[in-house]
Regions:
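Extracytoplasmic soluble-region selector
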Residues: 1-216
Length: 216
């Protein structure tokens, strides 16, 4: 149950017609531009033990793009990017499910020697890949919307900047999140294994490039 259903409602996720469930969906209901808290509680019908937690509903103050790397290699698997949102106190929101974002690839004015291009990077749909995203992302893609998680793939070498903006009008003053990505050639050294040399001996290395699944 929720102590303040007008702030955060709770819906059991179990068999139809049953009030008891081990899982539940908590949804933010408040539309007020202020920080509000509701107490979510669950009771074990056998032992009477009560579990509780606070559900804090607040406005987003800042967004950031989170990535495992800033470098992509041509011919590599797509890179998954995700948005983290923070409140005014720096706390991270638990979920951004359902929020619509506008992701765009823009030119990078600070390429620092890299070829700057807005066509070096391509945004992919999860529906076009073998990746399995959260179910709400797939539902948003079906209606041509973008959520807090996307895939990107390198098209050609260079540097590109990716920008993400919240579409909700209430967040028009929240600065877009940006991330700079570098797309590099997939270069290999042959031989690829460790070499142990005697003093005075040498070994010849060859540089090879992976292109369209073939080494050239």
């Amino acid at each position: 149950s929720s102590s303040r259903p007008e702030v955060a409602s709770i819906e059991p996720l179990g068999q139809d017609g049953l009030r008891c469930s081990q899982r539940a969906l908590v949804q933010a209901r408040s539309s007020q531009p202020t920080r509000l808290t509701a107490i979510i509680s669950a009771e074990d019908t056998l032992t009477g033990q009560v579990l509780r937690c606070d559900a804090i509903v607040d406005l987003i103050h800042d967004i950031q793009v989170v990535s495992t790397t800033r470098e992509l290699y041509l011919e590599d698997a797509p890179l998954e990017l995700k948005i983290h949102a923070l409140d005014s106190e720096g706390n991270t929101f638990s979920t951004l499910a359902g929020l619509v974002f506008d992701w765009t690839v823009v030119k990078d004015p600070e390429a620092n020697g890299f070829s700057d291009s807005d066509d070096a990077l391509r945004i992919l749909k999860f529906l076009e890949s073998t990746y399995i995203p959260p179910s709400y992302i797939l539902e948003m893609e079906k209606v041509a919307k973008q959520g807090d998680t996307i895939l990107v793939s390198g098209v050609r070498t260079g540097s590109s900047k990716l920008k993400a903006r919240l579409q909700e009008s209430i967040y028009k003053d929240v600065h877009p999140a940006e991330v700079r990505l570098f797309i590099l050639e997939n270069i290999l050294l042959n031989p690829v294994y460790d070499i142990y040399l005697l003093v005075g001996t040498s070994v010849q290395y060859r540089v090879q490039k992976l292109s369209q699944g073939k080494i050239t």
